[in-house]
UniProtKB/Swiss-Prot annotation:
Record function comment: Required for cellulose microfibril formation. Involved in cell wall assembly during cell elongation and cell plate maturation in cytokinesis. Required for secondary cell wall formation in the developing xylem. May cycle through different intracellular compartments, including plasma membrane.
Residue segments, region Polarized targeting signal 2 (PTS2): 59-62
Gene giving rise to this polypeptide: KOR
Glycosylation positions in this chain: N108, N133, N216, N324, N345, N408, N425, N567
The entry's keywords: Carbohydrate metabolism, Cell membrane, Cell wall biogenesis/degradation, Cellulose degradation, Glycoprotein, Glycosidase, Hydrolase, Membrane, Polysaccharide degradation, Signal-anchor, Transmembrane, Transmembrane helix
Protein name, entry field: Endoglucanase 25
Gene3D superfamilies, sorted: 1.50.10.10
SUPFAM superfamilies in alphabetical order: Six-hairpin glycosidases
Extracellular side: 92-621
Organs and tissues of expression: Highly expressed in roots and stems, at intermediate levels in leaves and flowers, and at lower levels in siliques. Expressed in xylem (at protein level).
Annotated catalytic residues: D165, H513, D561, E570
A GO molecular-function descriptor: cellulase activity
Phenotype upon loss of function: Plants are extremely dwarf and show severe abnormal morphology with incomplete cell walls, aberrant cell plates and multinucleated cells.
Length: 621
């Protein structure tokens, strides 16, 4: 039978397909019956066989928790496997040889730094700590100040002996402590890398603890302060036992040690002592109580110096003979700069940036000694210290004009150090003659080396590649080359092929003008004149005063290693302080231990932008 497909094709009724559909339907019905019968069979079986027993899970009771035994075994196994793996790795790490990169040997500047700091241990007065590390030194000067009847100063134990004698001159001692503090503030990372940070801070504190005894540091104002302990007067044939007539170990001193005070013109001494205390307060800023004590003392003594105008050395013959101060205006700027950094009080900045202050200090004079930084003249150091403020904080009006002047003058000083300009003569061996051929030149050259290196680091930190000398531009590397040339000369790169730092290298001075180093520690007490035989002996000193930088050669690079010729062989606190500062500034460059610390010195300085105005009063209708 045929029909027609409505889409155009034939439409057949296929009987075969129809039959197949019937068969398929019957098969499906059979499957359904089979599916229904299977659970019935299982049910019947359960009646006959009984219920199937379920397999019980096993657990482990750990006391605080119950866990599956399977999980417990898996966890323990994992931990054991991890422990075995860790042990295996540890065994490999410990047994397999490791190849460490070799630590570069310390450079000469770092080696010399260790020794130069040790000199201060040898110069300590008072009851020495057990770790002083100078075997031939002992307690000394324990009666200092105690014999002064009617005096406020009953305890002046401590501090440092100035040079080869046992006098404590507070003016150069304060300068030495300021230099040590300045070097720590700028280069604490280098001290830390050299393992000397704790040591140098202990040396500074030894000095500042003593300074706090030299005036009434707990008062709000003072009328005098100590300038000197001990005497060296041998004028007019004076034979009274004192620190210059006698030649004795400091430990054996039995003569009177007079105390000299200053109650008239003390501006230079007071301002320098303020600089020492203020700079040290930054070094010890983490010790809040001690730092606060130092700041208070610095304020009191600086104000005293401003009130009692005059040179401290004008009133005493000994001070004018040994450490004569040429003026006090440079100390006013130097001390005032440190007071500003230590306190953040803008009053100090206003004071030291007055043009008249700079004029009195000789900032515009020039002259043959302009740029010579020393225990006497602090102007070059003060100008660099204030150039730092302009470079990194740029305080602007009203300080910019005078700070720019200080900065320009600092650049001129740096130009004067370069050999191309012939401002200062040099020996044939290359030593700069900042004191124009006078004796004891090394103390001035190390100071110049420090200032040059520090200015170079300031410029580098300010992303400034150099500076101008007239129309010519010079890289900061030129300053470091100058500094290295001076320190290398002192360490042995000179015509005599000898080191002027005792204990550095194999050839160095053996007849140092120093009482303690020249007399053996042999349980024999040599009296005032009994020690003369050691003073006049031609034999080398029995004790090595390690790290002492002697006065130095003459203008012809000549050197006489004669104990009694102090112009060649005597070391000083001020000289060694400059040496330490220059050495740490140049040290560690191969190990990349960092350069200056830009921020620590500004810890107490507040923001220099104007205070914003107060908010307006609340609006009311």
């Amino acid at each position: 039978m045929y029909g027609r497909d409505p889409w155009g094709g034939p439409l057949e009724i296929n009987t075969a397909d129809s039959a197949t559909d019937d068969d398929r339907s019957r098969n499906l019905n059979d499957l359904d019956r089979a599916a229904l019968s299977r659970p019935l069979d299982e049910t019947q079986q359960s009646w006959l066989l009984g219920p199937t027993e379920q397999k019980k899970k096993k657990y482990v009771d750990l006391g605080c928790i119950i866990v599956s035994r399977k999980i417990f075994v898996w966890t323990v196994g994992t931990l054991v496997a991890a422990a075995l793996l860790a042990g295996f790795i540890t065994l490999i790490v410990k047994t397999v040889p490791r190849h460490h990169p070799k630590t570069p040997p310390p450079d000469n500047y770092t080696i010399a730094l260790h020794k130069a700091l040790k000199f201060f241990n040898a110069q300590k007065s008072g009851k020495l700590p057990k770790h002083n590390n100078v075997s031939w030194r002992g307690n000394s000067g324990l009666q200092d100040g105690k014999g002064e009847t009617g005096s406020f100063y009953k305890d002046l134990v401590g501090g440092y002996y100035d040079a080869g004698d046992a006098i404590k001159f507070n003016f150069p001692m304060a300068y030495a402590m300021t230099m040590l503090s300045w070097s720590v503030i700028e280069y604490s990372a280098k001290y830390e890398a050299a393992g000397e940070l704790t040591h140098v801070k202990e040396l500074i504190k030894w000095g500042t603890d003593y300074f706090l005894k030299t005036f009434n540091s707990t008062a709000d104002s003072i009328d005098d302060l100590v300038s000197q302990v001990g005497s060296g007067n041998t004028d007019d044939g004076n034979t009274d036992p004192n620190d210059h007539y006698c030649w004795m170990r400091p430990e054996d001193m039995d003569y009177k040690r007079p105390v000299t005070t200053c109650n008239g013109g003390c501006s230079d001494l007071a301002a320098e002592m303020a600089a020492a205390l203020a700079s040290a307060s930054i070094v010890f800023k983490d010790n809040k109580e001690y730092s606060k004590k130092l700041v208070h003392g610095a304020k009191v003594v600086y104000q005293f110096g401003r009130t009692r105008r005059g040179r401290y050395s004008a009133g005493t013959a000994e001070s004018s003979k040994f450490y004569n101060s040429s003026m006090y205006w440079d100390e006013f700027i130097w001390g005032g700069a440190w007071m500003y950094y230590a306190t953040g009080n803008v009053t100090y900045l206003n004071l030291i940036t007055q043009p008249t202050m700079a004029k009195h200090a000789g900032a515009f004079w020039g002259g043959p000694y302009y740029g010579v930084f020393s225990w006497d003249n602090k102007l070059a150091g003060a100008q660099l210290l204030l150039s730092r403020l302009r470079l990194f904080l740029s305080p602007g009006y009203p300080y910019e004009e005078i700070l720019r002047t200080f900065h320009n003058q600092t650049s001129i000083v740096m130009c004067s150090y370069l050999p191309i300009f012939n401002k200062f003569n040099r020996t044939n061996g290359g030593l700069i003659e900042l004191n124009h051929g006078a004796p004891q030149p090394l103390q001035y050259s190390v100071n110049a080396a420090f200032l040059a290196t520090l200015y170079s680091d300031y410029l580098d930190a300010a992303d400034t590649p150099g500076w101008y000398c007239g129309p010519n531009f010079y890289s900061t590397s030129v300053l470091r080359d100058f500094a290295r040339s001076q320190i290398d000369y002192i360490l042995g790169k000179n015509p005599r092929k000898m080191s002027y730092v005792v204990g550095f290298g194999t050839k160095y001075p053996r007849h140092v003008h120093h009482r303690g180093a020249s007399i053996p520690k042999n349980k024999v007490k040599y009296n005032c004149k009994g020690g003369w035989k050691w003073r006049d002996s031609k034999k080398p000193n029995p004790n090595t005063i390690e790290g002492a930088m002697v006065a130095g050669p003459d203008k012809r690079d000549g050197y006489r290693d004669v104990r009694m010729n102090y112009n060649y062989t005597e070391p000083t606190l001020a000289g060694n302080a400059g040496l330490v500062a220059a050495l740490v500034a140049l040290s560690g460059e191969e190990e990349a231990t960092g350069k200056i610390d830009k921020n620590t010195i500004f810890s107490a300085v507040p923001p220099l932008f104007p205070t914003p105005p107060p908010p307006p009063a609340p609006w009311k209708p």
